[in-house]
């Protein structure tokens, strides 16, 4: 990670759904890097717009709330930082839609099994 100025990222959370700024979001991937760690944040805005971006935390900064953000691209977004039910329901809705769309184009048995497995994971997950 190259040295850059660290800035606060309003949507980064401590994993409890809200941070000290009252911002929403879900950090779902944490990667160790040389100078600290990187977290990839996924989520939805109130209007349903999805977002995804990386947050870098430096071990050398004086507080854990000094973050550096990089603009990310919208990908497969599966969490909405309101309630566990909302999050799981949104994941399930997206998987169901994906399954329906793919079934129209004659998906393979492997793909169907993978989607069923994803839905089962969501049902059992403590998101």
Model-derived features: positions:
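Short, mixed-charge low-complexity intrinsically disordered segments
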Residues: 104-127
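Short aromatic-glycine-(Arg/Gly/Cys) micro-motifs in beta-strand/loop hairpins
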Residues: 58-75
């Amino acid at each position: 990670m190259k040295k850059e100025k660290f800035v606060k990222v309003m949507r980064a959370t401590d994993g409890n759904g809200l941070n000290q700024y009252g911002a929403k979001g879900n950090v779902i991937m944490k990667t160790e890097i040389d100078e600290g760690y990187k977290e990839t944040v996924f989520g939805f805005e109130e209007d349903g717009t999805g977002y995804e971006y990386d947050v870098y935390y430096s071990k050398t900064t004086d507080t854990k709330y000094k973050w550096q953000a990089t603009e990310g691209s919208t990908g497969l977004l599966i969490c909405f930082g309101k309630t566990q039910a909302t999050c799981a329901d949104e994941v399930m809705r997206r998987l169901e839609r994906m399954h329906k769309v793919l079934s129209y184009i004659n998906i393979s048995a492997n793909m169907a099994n993978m989607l069923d497995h994803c839905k089962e994971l969501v049902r059992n997950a403590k998101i």
